[in-house]
């Protein structure tokens, strides 16, 4: 867990956060580490370009903090109560409001959301600071390129949630996934190459190739994540199964489910998707519908196809070396978790 050790080292040297609740909430997800997929990707891309992955530790910590702030804000937007099997940042903040300030439930909810927004903002500044101290040009790239791409994808996700299903297109959903998920994977990959080669990602053909490989892997990862959100095990997934149905998330999985339904079935789907009070029986009906109409198999095949093509591009770009083999294993792990 070198990435998280580096993060805690950096945060330990950040003396300006003195407000107890803000520190507690901003660091809440870091106390329950994720898989650190993006720092691992960065280190492997650095090695593939002839560098030493140790050189990416600070940049990897920055990318993981960047990823974490986006999760905090995303959980507020999606009204999620669990992340990695633990209360989300705004839920943690609300509990602090009840316990320490004796707030009513309504006021505590507002307090928790405000804390999580500020906590996410704080982690974003830490991410940029950590990257800029180590690699100034990559810190600037994080601000000028990565952040707008990711935020555009997030906003498109929000906008799509207000569109009727019959006005959605697969193109819009792919665009959303490329911004919301693919951009950070691509950034991690190009940073690894840039650190190894000592040049800007724009000046490195290998950085561009591995960024495309990583972005495509991110798309496969997102498709797998969407499947886990409906068919996974809550204890392993760390979030309530079926929450995407109750939230009416506009995913490729659910759009294809909608498009495979008859008008009568669409009316029933419309009464369930986005209904926070949908019953367990209704959620199960949607799950069975997805299975029966082969949509689950379609999405699994789509993820496998994207991953296979990404690995082929990787193997065309790099000679057979241990880092290339590790990148292939890393990529395969993104989809393997749904099998």
Segments and roles (model prediction):
Residues 1-339:
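All-alpha prenyltransferase/terpene-synthase fold signal
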């Amino acid at each position: 867990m070198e990435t998280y050790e580096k993060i805690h080292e950096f945060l330990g040297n950040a003396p300006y956060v003195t407000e107890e609740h803000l520190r507690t909430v901003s660091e809440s997800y870091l106390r329950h580490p994720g898989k650190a997929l993006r720092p691992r990707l960065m280190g492997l891309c650095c090695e593939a370009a002839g560098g030493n992955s140790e050189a990416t530790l600070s940049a990897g910590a920055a990318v993981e903090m960047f990823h974490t702030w986006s999760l905090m804000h995303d959980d507020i937007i999606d009204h999620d109560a669990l992340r990695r099997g633990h209360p989300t940042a705004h839920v943690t903040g609300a509990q602090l409001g009840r316990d320490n300030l004796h707030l009513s439930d309504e006021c505590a909810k507002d307090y928790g959301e405000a804390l999580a927004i500020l906590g996410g903002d704080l982690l974003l500044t830490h991410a940029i600071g950590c990257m800029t101290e180590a690699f100034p040009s990559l810190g600037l790239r994080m601000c000028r390129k990565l952040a707008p791409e990711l935020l555009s994808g997030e906003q498109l996700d929000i906008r799509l949630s207000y569109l009727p299903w019959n006005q959605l297109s697969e193109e819009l959903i792919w665009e959303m996934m490329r911004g919301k998920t693919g951009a950070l994977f691509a950034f991690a990959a190009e940073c690894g190459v840039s650190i190894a080669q000592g040049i800007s990602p724009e000046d490195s053909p290998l950085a561009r190739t591995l960024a495309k490989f990583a972005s495509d892997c991110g798309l496969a990862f997102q498709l797998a994540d969407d499947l886990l959100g409906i068919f996974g095990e809550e204890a392993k997934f760390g979030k309530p199964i079926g929450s995407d149905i109750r939230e009416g998330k506009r995913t490729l999985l659910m759009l294809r489910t909608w498009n495979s339904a008859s008008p009568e079935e669409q009316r029933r789907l419309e009464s369930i998707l986005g209904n926070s009070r949908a019953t367990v029986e209704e959620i199960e009906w949607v799950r069975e519908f997805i299975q029966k109409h082969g949509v689950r198999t379609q999405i699994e095949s789509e993820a496998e196809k994207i991953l296979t093509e990404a690995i082929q591009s990787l193997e065309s770009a790099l000679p057979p070396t241990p880092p290339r083999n590790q990148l292939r294993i890393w990529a395969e792990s993104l989809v393997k978790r749904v099998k």
